[in-house]
């Protein structure tokens, strides 16, 4: 058989196989394109569905944490101030957290989303241990904050006063001097520090102490030592101690005031009973 005839026969045998390979390759390409188109269209539809606020709105608000000053409406209004709430997928919880922490009595807020439509917020409020310059409060760490006056209630707190930015210093002084006074059953009602670092105290019995600058603890100890003598003199004279000025190297200047009528009558009755 000639070489030409052999080549012709081989060519005829390969043609059907080549056609099948081409068809398979084309089918594979079409299938891949179909899959890609399906994924793209599906992703587009799902993304649109997730971004549709009518399908996945953050419509539920859950608040946790110990609250004394925060009302539900405070949080709701803080969130609405940012505009209409986003969807579960699009809402940035960090923005909400920052907005809530702008409330002056909020120490910390933790915000997270709960599928499918819930916003969970955990609140930590500042805990006041004293009032600061009448208008604010101070916590145990020396942080100052404010609370709406109608939410404070009847909570009785010591009063602290000082220059702006000195809350931590005044609080530390209040604690140290309060510990000294507590040993003799005194309680600090008020502590004030001037811009020159001069201290004035008011005790729970109404006595005012002027400690001046420097040696405050030494001067406070002097008052504790003098108090029994001053108290005895007050009872003898039928007066009360109004103030004690301790800005001296030794001794003190004492201011006296009349007893309130009820205390004066009580002392007179007690004296008469002792005479009988």
From Swiss-Prot:
| InterPro entries on file | Cell_div_FtsQ/DivIB_C, FtsQ, FtsQ_C_sf, POTRA, POTRA_FtsQ_type
Q: Where in the cell is it found?
A: Cell inner membrane
Region span, Disordered: 1-20, 257-276
Q: Which cysteines are joined by disulfide bonds?
A: none
**Which segments does the topology annotation call Periplasmic?**
50-276
**Which Pfam families does this one have?**
FtsQ_DivIB_C (PF03799), POTRA_1 (PF08478)
**UniProt keyword terms in alphabetical order:** Cell cycle, Cell division, Cell inner membrane, Cell membrane, Membrane, Transmembrane, Transmembrane helix
- Does the entry feature the keyword Cell cycle, yes or no? yes
Task: Describe the location of the POTRA domain by residue ranges.
Answer: 56-126
The protein, known as: Cell division protein FtsQ
Q: Which gene encodes it?
A: ftsQ
